[in-house]
């Protein structure tokens, strides 16, 4: 599975990528919204984990832009946020899921495993 991790915390993004690669996935990293959009225009991802708080804007706006692009319309996009109050709110409707930080290794492994299951 091809996974993109978008997080402005370099150490977190790199750790997520290392875990994914250790589980046999291909992992790429972007640290801001512009880089994420650029990566998605160059290749197709099966899963994008997208931080809400990015230095160049809101991850929700990046998600909306990705949903409009031909490259990521059907890609599973999961929000990463430190704000527990955002999980389940209507402003997160473009996302396929939401995980509240901090994320445990087990939660990341579970998410990657679930993303490999075809959607119904």
Q: Model segments located where?
A:
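Acidic catalytic/metal-coordinating carboxylates
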Residues: 32, 58-62
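The feature encodes the CheY-like receiver
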Residues: 55
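C-terminal output helix
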Residues: 103-112
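Hydrophobic/aromatic residues positioned on beta-strands within the core alpha/beta folds
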Residues: 78-80
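Two-component/phosphorelay signaling modules centered on CheY-like receiver
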Residues: 10-28
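Active-site residues of response regulator receiver
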Residues: 51
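Acidic, metal-coordinating helix/loop segments flanking the phosphotransfer/catalytic sites
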Residues: 29-47
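Alpha4 helix (beta4-alpha4-beta5 surface) of REC/receiver domains from two-component response regulators
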Residues: 61, 83-99, 110
